[in-house]
């Protein structure tokens, strides 16, 4: 399928059903368009096109005669307006809080709101259309136009009203209401949640300076089982993953659309950063453990954590742990691996098969295909798939939008919301003091990300055994 952006939108409005939502797996045209429109149709252009379709045009004399002969039937102009409102409603539902970041979206919502409230034609049509309720006072699928508009205007009243919730200045503060709950979940990256007197006017304390990697990780973790560690790790990973918006994934690959403010750190960036931190946290912990026995025990614990992450369907942390264990600075520690029980060496070899990149990571893809519930995907591979599709297919063919490319991109992106559905993970309780220590350790991972430094630490732990003396004695 290909066409100009305007023709694709026109075809969508002609064919879309008012019962279709953007996440419908059987009819994905609406979702594909809303997810990918920024690639070929910037928001400002979509804004103008939607208003044009909503306003329509004055009918000519011949069309008036035809409309008079169709008395009692649905007015096609009213049907088009309903479809425009339905499309925008689904768009706002997809964007969520992101609608606050785009001035073009806010301008469209405000202008459409004004048109809806002043549209006498729709108001008259709504009065002639009945509303049916069931015994639970829920509207049926034949909800009247008036009810749809009432709900739609309710959405419009609330989206722009929250635009000033985010501070734009480093010294700008927004007090939390006394009645507000769950405030920490709404704190974005680049912001801090500080506790200070309600009447206080002073600046909160500055954040603590970042410290180096944890020393004695073996001592810190020896009081916890690998299952407890993996469960807490999984709970925090889900906490971050649930905040990732599917459009963050699109923008990570193709860039942000025109007119979209921000461009700062997203939850996806934090998730990817945590993947690298977890990987080097494992390598650093092993390379900083000087005692051979403790180092082997730490290696065994990390292997069991990786196995537990696989059981929890946390493939992102599973890959991070396995990449850490497969790092060159760790793999060369032959004395450490020799002290590992054969059972755990076998477990590691079985888990290592999932890392096989051959046939486009066929083993991993077959594994996750068998999961019948939500799981944490290996996001770097998902981003690689998107990049391959984006760079391997032209956006325009002969001046027309290659919408088949948009379908392929949307199909991969839709994995994110599908994986986020129906997942409720809570952190296990270990007692207040133990839980607080573990929470800080797993949520503030630190590690050495310089491979040269890690290799040097590894060499100091276990010098090469096959190498002869650096300066062999000369013959006499």
Where in this protein do the model-derived segments appear?
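Alpha-helical solenoid scaffolds in large eukaryotic transport, assembly, and signaling factors
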Residues: 1-83, 87-101, 241-244, 249-309, ...
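Hydrophobic residues within the alpha-helices of tandem HEAT/HEAT-like
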Residues: 37-40, 87-93, 131-136, 306, ...
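Short acidic/histidine-centered micro-motifs embedded in hydrophobic/aromatic stretches
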Residues: 49, 53, 108, 321-325, ...
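Alpha-helical scaffold repeats of the Armadillo/HEAT/TPR superfamily
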Residues: 53-54, 102-117, 339-347
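Long amphipathic alpha-helical scaffold regions
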Residues: 58-73, 329-358
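Long, hydrophobic, amphipathic alpha-helical segments used as structural scaffolds
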Residues: 95-99, 103, 120, 313, ...
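Intrinsically disordered, proline- and charge-rich regulatory regions
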Residues: 118-255, 261-273, 289, 293, ...
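Extended alpha-helical coiled-coil scaffold domains characteristic of the BAR superfamily
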Residues: 302-318, 325-332, 358, 372-375, ...
């Amino acid at each position: 399928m290909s066409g100009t952006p305007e023709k694709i939108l026109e075809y969508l409005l002609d064919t879309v059903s008012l019962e279709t939502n953007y996440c419908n797996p059987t009819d994905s045209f609406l979702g594909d368009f809303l997810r990918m429109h920024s690639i070929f149709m910037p928001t400002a252009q979509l804004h103008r096109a939607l208003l044009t379709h909503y306003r329509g045009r004055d009918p000519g004399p011949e069309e008036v005669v035809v409309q008079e002969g169709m008395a009692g039937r649905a007015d096609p102009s009213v049907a088009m307006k309903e479809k425009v409102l339905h499309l925008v409603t689904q768009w706002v539902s997809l964007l969520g809080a992101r609608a606050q970041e785009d001035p073009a979206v806010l301008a469209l919502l405000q202008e459409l709101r004004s048109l809806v409230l002043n549209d006498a034609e729709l108001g008259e049509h709504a009065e002639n259309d009945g509303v049916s309720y069931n015994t639970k006072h829920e509207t049926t699928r034949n909800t009247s136009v008036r009810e749809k508009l009432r709900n739609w205007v309710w959405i419009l009243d609330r989206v722009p009203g929250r635009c000033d919730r985010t501070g734009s200045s480093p010294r700008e503060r927004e007090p939390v209401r006394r009645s507000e709950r769950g405030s920490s979940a709404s704190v974005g990256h680049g912001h801090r949640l500080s506790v200070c007197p309600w009447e206080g006017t002073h600046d909160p304390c500055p954040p603590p300076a970042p410290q180096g990697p944890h020393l004695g990780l073996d001592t810190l973790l020896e009081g916890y089982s690998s299952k407890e560690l993996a469960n807490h790790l999984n709970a925090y990973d889900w906490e971050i993953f649930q905040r990732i918006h599917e459009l963050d994934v699109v923008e990570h690959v193709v860039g942000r659309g025109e007119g979209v403010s921000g461009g700062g750190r997203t939850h996806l960036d934090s998730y990817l950063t945590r993947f690298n931190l977890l990987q080097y946290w494992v390598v650093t912990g092993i390379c900083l453990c000087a005692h051979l026995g403790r180092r082997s025990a730490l290696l065994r614990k990390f292997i069991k954590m990786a196995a537990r992450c696989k059981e929890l369907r946390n493939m992102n942390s599973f890959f991070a742990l396995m990449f850490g264990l497969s790092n060159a600075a760790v793999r060369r520690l032959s004395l450490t691996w020799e002290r590992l029980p054969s059972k755990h060496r076998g477990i590691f070899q079985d888990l290592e098969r999932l890392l096989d990149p051959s046939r486009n990571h066929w083993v991993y893809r077959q594994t996750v295909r068998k999961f019948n519930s939500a799981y944490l995907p290996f996001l770097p591979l998902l981003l690689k798939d998107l990049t391959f599709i984006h760079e391997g297919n032209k956006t325009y063919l002969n001046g027309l939008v290659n919408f088949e490319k948009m379908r392929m991109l949307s199909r991969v992106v839709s994995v994110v919301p599908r994986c986020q559905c129906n997942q409720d993970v809570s952190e296990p309780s270990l007692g207040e003091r133990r839980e607080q220590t573990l929470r800080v350790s797993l949520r503030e991972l630190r590690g050495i990300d310089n491979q040269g430094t890690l290799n040097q630490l590894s060499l100091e732990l276990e010098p090469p055994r096959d190498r002869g003396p650096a300066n062999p004695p000369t013959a006499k």
